[in-house]
Structures are given as structure tokens and as C-alpha cells.
Amino acid sequence: MKLSRLALLSVFALASAPSWAESVVTVYSIDGLHDGDNSWYQVQFDAFTKATGITVRYVEGGGGVVVERLAKERTNPQADVLVTAPPFIQRAAAEKLLANFNTDAASAIPDANNLYSPLVKNYLSFIYNSKLLKTAPASWQDLLDAKFKNKLQYSTPGQAADGMAVMLQAFHSFGSKDAGFAYLGKLQANNVGPSASTGKLTALVNKGEIYVANGDLQMNLAQMERNPNVKIFWPANDKGERSALAIPYVIGLVQGAPQSENGKKLINFLLSKEAQTRVSELSWGMPVRSDVTPSDEHYKAATAALEGVQSWQPNWDDVAVSLSADISRWHKVTESE
């Protein structure tokens, strides 16, 4: 998931848009669920249009970028549905960009509330070149080894959601912000440099240009089919514990949405059992509904990858409040201002 790109994708031809004015729903979404020719989004949008006659207009951008666009359009909203990741969904809620809406699936989705709901589970992950490294780096301390100098890269906090996740994971693994920042300052000696895109790092690892990079589980599992030298790992802390920050895709209804009822219909459709059952099959994500357990091979691979890894999440409201200050401090400790 990245924060730098904003692109308008028309899911269906809109030549007759004026006559369809009330049969359209506009989605502003973070990337990741519309990748490939037969993505989860594409399949669900097609099925939604077939069932309702409502065309989906799709705008893709970074988690922060789509929220910023909503804020700029506050007096004249253009979107009906927002999909982003924490802490950007919390920022949207705090800025009153989201409308009250309890989804039909709320009782089956942990952490759903009246402003937003998790849509697809996802987790921070790390990748390494298994052709050049016999084993994955076992611990965070291993990544400080001189053999990784200019062979390690992680995406930049503030530019990439997964880069922000690395920063938060360091706070968690080392027990405090101070200790996490101290570690990231040391790690900078091996870091190739800034990267606005997390997804592009996978090809560099596969080629052996770098040995280690960050990512997210859904994206990395999908990319491994095209990048055979890449494997996933999670470094352990000094107690030998491996953990992964949960960074789900989250969905909400836009405040003042021009087609609010259509937005509600689409949200309920994407959170339905039928749609959730196919998210792993089509996009390597994991369903958020407690009453859905897919049986496809992608789901089995994702759950197997997480064996022995403890998932966790911070208080995202607190993260949203301190994020700007934390990113500024990251730039200082890494001397990357």
C-alpha cells in the first residue's frame, strides 16, 4: 500500500454518465485490491452492477492522499465511499469526513463502529532474497549486520503506509518510541535510502539488488508468484517473539455523499458473506467477518505464513494524533530531512 499515487480508473464506460446520474457510486480507495485482471474489486464491482444496475466509479490513491482529497472537497463532496488504512481512516473520522452508518455485517466484524468498518485483513511483513540468503534474518539485531549495508531498504514513513507500519512495529518490538527510534537510527547505516513505494521494493529483492525490504502480507503473497526468489519473514525481538502489525483496509460512508444510498448498498455488498469469502482467492487478502472462513489455497497460505507470529494493533486514534510529530522525529534520527 503506498501513499504517492492518485489515479482515476473508470471501472465501466461512462459515456452515458448524465443519464445514469442516480445509478452511480464513486469510491475513493487505497491501492491493493484492484491489482490484476481479475481482482477482488473488479469481480465484486461487476457483480454489484449486475445485481443493482449501479455503476462503480473508482478513484485510487494513497491512504493519506484520498483522505486529503475528501477534505478538499468537503463543501462539494464527489465521493460516496472511502477505503483507506489506519490511521488515515481515524483522521477522516476526526475531521468529520465520514457519515454515521451501521453496516448490515457490523455484528460479525470486530472493531466495526458507526463511522467505519474493517474491510479486508492485512499485516505488515518483511521479505528477503532466499537465493542469496540461506535463511531469513532471525531478529531485528541481525538486520544491523554490516552484510546488509546498502542491501536493505524500507519505504519511507509519511510517504508509504507500509513504511509508517515499520516505524510503529519498531516502537512495539523494542518496547517504546525512544527505543524504537534509537534502533531505526542505527538501521539507517544499512538503509539504501528513501522509497515512496513499497511495492517496487519486491522486484529489487527478487533481483538481488537488495536482500531485505518491507511489505505487507497481502501484497507480498500476490507478488511471490512473479518473484520466485522472494520469501516472507518477521524479525524477532530480544525475547525471541515475532509480531506483525495489523493494517487492515477500512471502509466508510462519506459525509454528504452525493449518492449516499448507493454508497450504503456497495458497502453492505462488499461486506457480505459472498464477497468476503472470495477476497483471499482473488486478492490474497483475508476476510474480516468472524463467520467467514475461506477454503482456497491462498487463504491457507496466508494463515500458514502467520503461524507463530502474534498480530497486534495500537490505539489508532493515538497514532493519528502523534503521527506528524513521529514522522518528523523519524527524519531527525535517520538524518533524512
Swiss-Prot record:
Gene: phnS
SUPFAM superfamilies on file: Periplasmic binding protein-like II (SSF53850)
The species this protein was found in: Salmonella choleraesuis (strain SC-B67)
Top-level taxon of the source organism: Bacteria
Role this protein plays: Probably part of the PhnSTUV complex (TC 3.A.1.11.5) involved in 2-aminoethylphosphonate import.
Gene Ontology MF annotations: thiamine binding; thiamine pyrophosphate binding
UniProt-recorded name of the protein: Putative 2-aminoethylphosphonate-binding periplasmic protein
CDD domains attached to this UniProt entry: PBP2_AEPn_like
Keyword rRNA-binding: no
